[in-house]
Structures are given as structure tokens and as C-alpha cells.
Amino acid sequence: KKVFCSRSLFELLGIQETDEDYTYLELEGFAKMMQVLGNGIRESEDVSLYQISREHSIQYLRLKIVKAENGYQTGVLLDVTEEVEKQQRLERERDYDQLTDLYNRGAFRRSTEALLGSGKLSCAALIMWDLDNLKYVNDTYGHEMGDRYIRLFADQLKRLSSLGAVVERHSGDEFMAFLCGDSEEQIREEIRQFFCSVRDVSLKVDEDYELPLRASAGVTWYPRQARDFASLTRYADFAMYMAKHSTK
């Protein structure tokens, strides 16, 4: 059996095979050539999306297989890089906070609820932070410095992401994280280490003064204290409020 291949197929695959408008390949040779696509993402029964790493870019190709009544199959390979990148930009704008590059509220809730509904969690903590001194920074040094203060804390939170936590900017000066683990003891230690690292961070607001980075936090535990997202958030919010006002 032989496979009819157009010249554009070779061009899409980055293979210089022929100068003719089309050629025929043995089935075995065709299958070997198509291995350059790797493992694709099945979008439907007959359509798959492939990602190929080029020297300076990523290319996305969509392969659609059409089955004819006579038993023959026709494959159409399209370059859909522009379409996929546009969709990725839209999804990023939908899911991420522009100032901090953390999840926004909607994306955080979807991700956390997916984990809660997975049936795979043994223990987790939902932590809510409220930045201390942000109003002071804004009023004294301006909102640009306030944005730097916010980003500084967001950069610390990204360390929790490396531990598998889901993190977000909840509102102007509030942040949340959902941290999973094998036990409360393990998660407590990770939270403690995070707080210790934050206490060593400060924002240089002028030549003579650095403002320590500070935030009040509340923690609630899954499954011991709550099992659904709304309850976990409500309890963490209350715990954060109590922590913030008990230190005033």
C-alpha cells in the first residue's frame, strides 16, 4: 500500500522530501515520517492537535482523518498555530491577574473545586492573606510603589506554587492559596517556612528606608473543618480577620 502525499505536507512537517507537487510513500515510510508529530491531543474521534518544537518557536498542527465508504482514508494537516496562540492568549487574559501573574478568583475557584471533587485529597489547607500596610504605602509613596508591594508578595506566593499549591490574587490586597499534602503537620511546616521566608523580605521605598513585607493570614483545613470551597473560604476569611485585628 502507498500513501499519496502533497508537497505542503512535507513543508508543514519541516521535511525537504520532494520538489514535486505530490509523491507516493510506502505505508511504513509514511508512518515513520509522521512520528515527528509525537503524541497529539485528541480533540474528537477523527481530529488530533499536535505541538512541534521548532528552533525558535512552537508550531501547532491539526490532523483530521476522513474515512471514505470505499475504505480509503484521507488526512488533512493544517497549521493552526495562530488560532491556538490566540486561544491561549484569551484563556490567559480570562484566568490570570495582570498585575501579579497569579490566578484570578474565577480560575482559582475552578482549579480548587476540581481538586476538591477529585476524591484524591487526604488533607489540604486553604490560606487567605491580607497585606498589611498597603494603604500606608499607597498614601505615602504612591500607587506605583503600592503595586510593587503587591507584586513583591505575589512573587513570594509563587514559591508555594512550586510545592503544588494553587495561588491567586483574590482582590486588591487579598491573596489565597490551596495547599495539599499528606497530613496537617506536613502542611503546617510548609506554611511556617513560607512565613519565615516572607519575614526576610522588604521593599526599598527610598534611599534610606526599606519597608518589611507583612501580611495577616487565616487558615482553614480540609476535611477537618470544611469540605466545600465556599465554607473553606468563609472560615479562612474569618480566621484572617481575627488574626489581623488581634495584632492591632
Identify the role of each PLM range.
Residues V3-L13:
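N-terminal capping loop/helix in small sensory signaling domains highlighted by a polar->aromatic N-x2-3-F motif
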Residues E11, E91-D95, L102-A125, D132-S162, ...:
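Conserved long alpha-helical elements within nucleotide-processing catalytic cores of c-di-GMP signaling
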Residues L13, E20-S53, L116-G117:
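Terminal output helix/cap of sensory domains in signal transduction proteins
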Residues K64-A68, V201, T220:
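Output-coupling edge of small sensory domains
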Residues V167, Q193, S216-R224, S231-T247:
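Cyclic nucleotide signaling catalytic output domains
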Residues R169-H170, I187, V198-A215, K244:
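Catalytic core regions of nucleotide second-messenger enzymes
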